[in-house]
Amino acid sequence: MIQPTVKMPKKSVKERQQQVLEVLIGLLNSEDGMQRVTTERLAKAVGVSEGALYRYFPSKTKMFEALIERIEQTLTGYINASKRKENTTASTVKAILYTVIEFARKNPGVTRILTGHALMFEDDQLKARVAKFFDGLEFQFANILQMSKLREGKTFEDERALAGYLVNFCEGQFLRLVRSNFSYNQHQHFEKQWALIKPLFE
C-alpha cells in the first residue's frame, strides 16, 4: 500500500525571522561568541542558503537591530516588574541593577552585543542603536528617581546625573563579564557595591 505523502506546513516569515534570531543569539552565546558571525556561518547554522536569509531580513544589520529591540523589550518587562513589586526608590533601583546584571550574566551573547564586542565588524548604525538602548535605560532610571518625589516626597539634586551613574555601573559590570569570559561572579561583590551606592538614596 502506498502511504500518502504528508506535507509539513511551511514556516511563516515571522517564524523564520524568530528562528534566525534564536540561532544568531545561540552563536553569540557559544564559546566562539567573540568570533565574527558571517552570513555564511549563520545560514549554515539555520540550515538555509545565504540567499534565503535575505528573504527574512534585508541585511545582517537588520537582524542585529531586531535582536537589540528584543533585548530592550525583555529588560523593560523586567524593569516594570521590579517597579510594581518594590515599595521604595532604593529597593526598586537595587532590584533593577541586580536583574540587569543577572540578565547579562545568563546571556553572554546579549552582553557581547551591548558592550560592542559582537559589533566590531558591523555597521556603525548598530553602535548608535546600542547607545540608544543605554539612553533608554538611563531614562528609565531617571523616571524612577522623579517618581520618588510623588511616592516618598524625596528629591534628588540631579536625577539625570544619578541615572547616568547607574547606567555606567551596569556597563562596567557588562565589560567585566566579557573581559573575564563570563567567569567573573558579580554576586560575590554586589551587596558590597550596593552598600556604596545606597547612601545616594538616603
Swiss-Prot record:
One of its GO terms (cellular component) is cytoplasm. The keyword NADP does not apply. It is found in: Cytoplasm, Nucleoid. GO terms for molecular function: sequence-specific DNA binding. PROSITE patterns: HTH_TETR_1, HTH_TETR_2. The keyword Iron-sulfur does not apply. Transmembrane segments: none annotated. Residues 38-57 bind DNA. SUPFAM superfamilies: Homeodomain-like. Keywords: Cell cycle, Cell division, Cytoplasm, DNA-binding. GO terms for biological process: cell division; negative regulation of division septum assembly. Residues 14-75 form the HTH tetR-type domain. InterPro entries: DNA-bd_HTH_TetR-type_CS (IPR023772), Homeodomain-like_sf (IPR009057), HTH-type_Tx_Regulator (IPR050624), HTH_TetR (IPR001647), NO_SlmA (IPR023769), SlmA-like_C (IPR054580). Homodimer. Interacts with FtsZ. Required for nucleoid occlusion (NO) phenomenon, which prevents Z-ring formation and cell division over the nucleoid. Acts as a DNA-associated cell division inhibitor that binds simultaneously chromosomal DNA and FtsZ, and disrupts the assembly of FtsZ polymers. SlmA-DNA-binding sequences (SBS) are dispersed on non-Ter regions of the chromosome, preventing FtsZ polymerization at these regions. PANTHER family: ACREF/ENVCD OPERON REPRESSOR-RELATED, ACREF_ENVCD OPERON REPRESSOR-RELATED. Belongs to the nucleoid occlusion factor SlmA family. This is Nucleoid occlusion factor SlmA.
